[in-house]
Amino acid sequence: MTDSKYFTTTKKGEIFELKAELNSDKKEKKKEAVKKVIASMTVGKDVSALFPDVVNCMQTDNLELKKLVYLYLMNYAKSQPDMAIMAVNTFVKDCEDPNPLIRALAVRTMGCIRVDKITEYLCEPLRKCLKDEDPYVRKTAAVCVAKLHDINAQLVEDQGFLDTLKDLISDSNPMVVANAVAALSEIAESHPSSNLLDLNPQSINKLLTALNECTEWGQIFILDCLANYMPKDDREAQSICERVTPRLSHANSAVVLSAVKVLMKFMEMLSKDLDYYGTLLKKLAPPLVTLLSAEPELQYVALRNINLIVQKRPEILKHEMKVFFVKYNDPIYVKLEKLDIMIRLASQANIAQVLAELKEYATEVDVDFVRKAVRAIGRCAIKVEQSAERCVSTLLDLIQTKVNYVVQEAIVVIKDIFRKYPNKYESVIATLCENLDSLDEPEARAAMIWIVGEYAERIDNADELLESFLEGFHDESTQVQLQLLTAIVKLFLKKPTETQELVQQVLSLATQDSDNPDLRDRGYIYWRLLSTDPVAAKEVVLAEKPLISEETDLIEPTLLDELICYIGTLASVYHKPPSAFVEGGRGVVHKSLPPRTASSESAESPETAPTGAPPGEQPDVIPAQGDLLGDLLNLDLGPPVSGPPLATSSVQMGAVDLLGGGLDSLMGDEPEGIGGTNFVAPPTAAVPANLGAPIGSGLSDLFDLTSGVGTLSGSYVAPKAVWLPAMKAKGLEISGTFTRQVGSISMDLQLTNKALQVMTDFAIQFNRNSFGLAPAAPLQVHAPLSPNQTVEISLPLSTVGSVMKMEPLNNLQVAVKNNIDVFYFSTLYPLHILFVEDGKMDRQMFLATWKDIPNENEAQFQIRDCPLNAEAASSKLQSSNIFTVAKRNVEGQDMLYQSLKLTNGIWVLAELRIQPGNPSCTDLELSLKCRAPEVSQHVYQAYETILKN
């Protein structure tokens, strides 16, 4: 009979029966009882009451029974730490058992019991197992060191286990070497500064020797370790590559990806003139192609990694286009990834083949896939200039199918083709206009409106077409409204006499009838431009547009280099560095590729050159979307660096003159408009303050930076509060506050002894918390604390402790021990102690980031009864590391744009509105934007605390 019988029982009150069976003299009965206990535990029943009875069964020679008891022990040791100590003697005994399987089982279980109380008892058995004669025991003990380090790092260091682990790298058994490497890598990742894996050519040679003999998972550990090594020159890099290359033909896809990672990294150091370099490129293609014949889930992971490889080195797979053609039974997520890679590999040589495929895909039934295929045709046109005409012809064929969603996607991509190749394909506009009535998606409607506005002089009835859109203006999405506003202003500047009523109608709708601040602001800007200087308006609105970038979705080069170092990990699937998604960022190391050799740089061909050319050599193109995302993802690497001032063109200067601070003087002027129309400037009261200026448009100079920002005077410190009253702590009273001085966080404590006995042996510990706060040093009370004595201590804190989200976010649970007892209390720390000194963001970056953070992440607050002017507020906030990036005055209202950064790299952007010189209005308005919205409430509380004290 199978073991399934143990899971079918529904008896009640069986704990007593099991207890009796566990204490039976018969071995078989005991084993049956333990199996029943494990079955109950597996289905979620609480059998912790049987702990002492199960532990008694450990004293057995039966390996199966011992395994079951150890399984039970691992599960319940944490909830029964006092009882778990009972098992220590058996562990010690089992670690000396003649059977290596039992020795290994004992040491494995020891590592899985995460109970502080018993860790010190396990050191001696572990030390013996690390030097055991049997390699199976040694390899198990190596992993146990990493587990023990996670529970008590200091203990592991004090006991010298790390040195023993390093010695195991030279072990004669390859599996021991692999496990030692895995354990050291794990420890090194959680303590990046420890320099545990101090690799040198000798140790690398040992690892490469072990690589050929250990299991597939052992090979992965060793390859990942090799990827962290920096060869001293290109000869050593080539030697390592030669010995790693055979792993490319391994059956396990994880081994293949780890080998690819090592080769991609070390190829950076090889000269392109070398014959070996070309050979290596050829060897990399077949294993990557083979990965695409695996099951869909593996294919997806492989494709996400190939996407990175193709961006870094397209020459590897340039002849393998066919393997990325979509199969009818591929899941949608595989299809979309394949499409993306097809576009990246598209070139003049294979474009005919690619277009034929894409046209075929556009007739499929899967709507999402069809949309992506149509977009892909447009991207091919932009990437391969010689194919543009063929692509436009293909898109027109698809429009003739009259399939609604195909038509709409085609119009969206044709807009981009017009941008890339001006005055070349405008003959198709008539065909596009025929489909105007069928457009119901915002993006397609916006694209069509852009085309009509941009080429209004070529379309006879452009005013009628735009007027038809204007009829339902308030029902349109914001995207369409903004595009319609701009298109009608363009039309007016091209045909002023015929469209006066139309432009006044749209400006009125945008500025007076709309609640959307972006739309309102753009309406006011156009209105003022037209009413003040029509010539400048023409220069701004009808300015020559920059070229559209060939690859709008290439990953930014520095981010790409970092992601190449993470091939085969979750980061390579997300296309984000670990610091962007690992909670708290603890132990996250930023990796980068080795520097290129001089010969490899000089030999780089134009086709394969990476996209990050120096700024002086780049054409004036729209920055790739990936660039901005890359910058935002890497904001936590250090303070934003201000670049040199940008040279503004005459058009940009015009925008600044029109809009920068001199708005009041414009309000009364009503010069002659274009075509004799008098534009009345809009009412002053309704002018909103908004940051919606495009980056680099000159509108960013609306910010009027003042030199009167306050100087540093030390972060605000709250008065001490009683955290633990004497009546709850047997006479020990603890008061305290938190401070931040010159980048160091401290907990300032006041300990008072209100008991009748002397207090000694003080220690302190924090529970895991949202920002990893932990004591950076022991609690030093140098002399015994006598009755009625008070002592003040400043305890330095670090932010590298364990992270766990607390409720509320700034909750800190503390345990204080002395010779009397252990006492627990919780307190709320002010968030401003986590505001770091390099939290001032560059103005351009501020604008880009503000726009990039979704509007739903914005939070609005009011700070009541705070009669401060802008200078005083800015000075107070700067002393607590809230930095003023820019200041504006709009209609008598001071606007401070501010940035701050938390210790875990989260940026918070703020807009603070102040009414200066108005004693009746002392309320300040605060808008906060952040990628982690749950932080906003606590940042607001910090603002209120700092400004009111």
UniProtKB/Swiss-Prot annotation:
What residues bear N6-acetyllysine in this entry?
K318
Q: Where is this region: Disordered?
A: 584-625
Q: Which InterPro entries match?
A: AP_beta, AP_complex_bsu_1_2_4, ARM-like, ARM-type_fold, Armadillo, B-adaptin_app_sub_C, Clathrin/coatomer_adapt-like_N, Clathrin_a/b/g-adaptin_app_Ig
Give the UniProt keywords, A-Z. Acetylation, Cytoplasmic vesicle, Deafness, Disease variant, Golgi apparatus, Ichthyosis, Membrane, Nitration, Protein transport, Transport
Question: Taking the first listed entry, what is the main subcellular location of this protein, grouped into a coarse class?
Answer: Golgi
Q: Which GO terms describe its molecular function?
A: clathrin binding; protein kinase binding
> What is its biological role?
Subunit of clathrin-associated adaptor protein complex 1 that plays a role in protein sorting in the late-Golgi/trans-Golgi network (TGN) and/or endosomes. The AP complexes mediate both the recruitment of clathrin to membranes and the recognition of sorting signals within the cytosolic tails of transmembrane cargo molecules.
| Disorder this protein is connected to according to its UniProt record | Keratitis-ichthyosis-deafness syndrome, autosomal recessive: An autosomal recessive form of keratitis-ichthyosis-deafness syndrome, a disease characterized by the association of hyperkeratotic skin lesions with vascularizing keratitis and profound sensorineural hearing loss. KIDAR patients manifest ichthyosis, failure to thrive and developmental delay in childhood, thrombocytopenia, photophobia, and progressive hearing loss. Low plasma copper and ceruloplasmin levels have been reported in some patients.
The record, for PANTHER family, names:
ADAPTOR COMPLEX SUBUNIT BETA FAMILY MEMBER
Write down what this protein is called. AP-1 complex subunit beta-1
Give the originating organism: Homo sapiens
